[in-house]
């Protein structure tokens, strides 16, 4: 049986979505209803801690798993503080660690991410760290208690696709926790490719939120992720350098 279990929770849909950049955040409810998406990320700064004013949580169905991220954190200490605030605000104990001090490419700081992961895992958080693809860092995150690792496919928000494919492939082969491809995926075909490689899930935000029709794009991504997973489970045939006939080339008309 093909199961994805993270933090004791079994997930049936392997597409995770972000909640940022939508022109109308109310479409998130429709996306969840039509695709069955179960995990939605949210930046804590978009959650009303006082209960007053606009609150992104009003647009996310209660049956979803909230995955607060530590967007804005530049150090492990800041990420830890944001995660604790999110849990205190009622966002649950799942957290996506983002520690970014690079303002140009927004690449994650793996060293600070490892530090934050260790502390928060000890405190009972289900930690999903966003990371720059690197096998040694992924192994350190595992040892620190990460429930999954989330390597980037390309820099955040670029829609450039799976540029880190070969390193992500190594992580999938060598990591004992789920590998969730996060950031940079721009088209459903790219999500399908990640899943065909054996990724456990894909997290997509910009490609859906900035599409001409976000709801239709979300449906396309959900189907692509499911198809890619099925293809992986089906064990695709090997690639060969030369052509191989699918029917005999001799004997039909005699020798």
Swiss-Prot record:
The active site is at 96 (schiff-base intermediate with dxp). Its main location: cytoplasm. It is found in: Cytoplasm. 1-deoxy-D-xylulose 5-phosphate binds at residues 157, 183-184, 205-206. InterPro entries: Aldolase_TIM (IPR013785), Thiazole_synthase_ThiG (IPR033983), ThiG (IPR008867). GO terms for cellular component: cytoplasm. GO terms for molecular function: thiazole synthase activity. It catalyses: [ThiS sulfur-carrier protein]-C-terminal-Gly-aminoethanethioate + 2-iminoacetate + 1-deoxy-D-xylulose 5-phosphate = [ThiS sulfur-carrier protein]-C-terminal Gly-Gly + 2-[(2R,5Z)-2-carboxy-4-methylthiazol-5(2H)-ylidene]ethyl phosphate + 2 H2O + H(+). Keywords: Cytoplasm, Schiff base, Thiamine biosynthesis, Transferase. Pathway: Cofactor biosynthesis; thiamine diphosphate biosynthesis. One of its GO terms (biological process) is thiamine diphosphate biosynthetic process. Its EC number is 2.8.1.10. Catalyzes the rearrangement of 1-deoxy-D-xylulose 5-phosphate (DXP) to produce the thiazole phosphate moiety of thiamine. Sulfur is provided by the thiocarboxylate moiety of the carrier protein ThiS. In vitro, sulfur can be provided by H(2)S. Homotetramer. Forms heterodimers with either ThiH or ThiS. PANTHER family: THIAZOLE SYNTHASE (PTHR34266:SF2). This is Thiazole synthase. It comes from Heliobacterium modesticaldum (strain ATCC 51547 / Ice1).
């Amino acid at each position: 049986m093909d199961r994805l279990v993270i933090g004791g929770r079994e997930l049936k849909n392997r597409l995770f979505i972000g909640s940022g950049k939508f022109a109308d955040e109310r479409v998130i409810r429709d996306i969840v209803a039509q695709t069955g998406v179960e995990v939605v990320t949210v930046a804590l700064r978009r959650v009303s801690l006082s209960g007053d004013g606009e609150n992104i949580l009003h647009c996310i169905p209660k049956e979803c798993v909230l995955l607060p991220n530590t967007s804005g954190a530049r150090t492990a200490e800041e990420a830890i503080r944001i995660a604790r605030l999110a849990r205190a605000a009622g966002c649950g104990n799942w957290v996506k660690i983002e520690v970014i001090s690079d303002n140009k490419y927004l690449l994650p700081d793996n060293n600070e991410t490892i530090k934050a992961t260790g502390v928060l895992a000890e405190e009972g958080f289900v930690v999903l760290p966003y990371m720059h693809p690197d096998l040694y860092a992924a192994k350190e995150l595992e040892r620190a208690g990460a429930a999954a690792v989330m390597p980037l496919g390309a820099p955040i928000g670029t829609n450039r696709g799976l540029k880190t494919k070969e390193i992500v492939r190594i992580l999938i082969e060598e990591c004992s926790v789920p590998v969730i491809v996060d950031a940079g995926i721009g088209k459903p075909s790219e999500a399908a490719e990640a899943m065909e490689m054996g990724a456990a899930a894909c997290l997509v935000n910009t490609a859906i939120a900035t599409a001409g029709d976000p709801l239709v794009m979300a449906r396309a991504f959900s189907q692509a992720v499911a198809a890619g997973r099925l293809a992986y489970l089906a064990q695709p045939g090997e690639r060969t350098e030369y052509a191989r006939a699918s029917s005999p080339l001799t004997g039909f008309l005699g020798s």
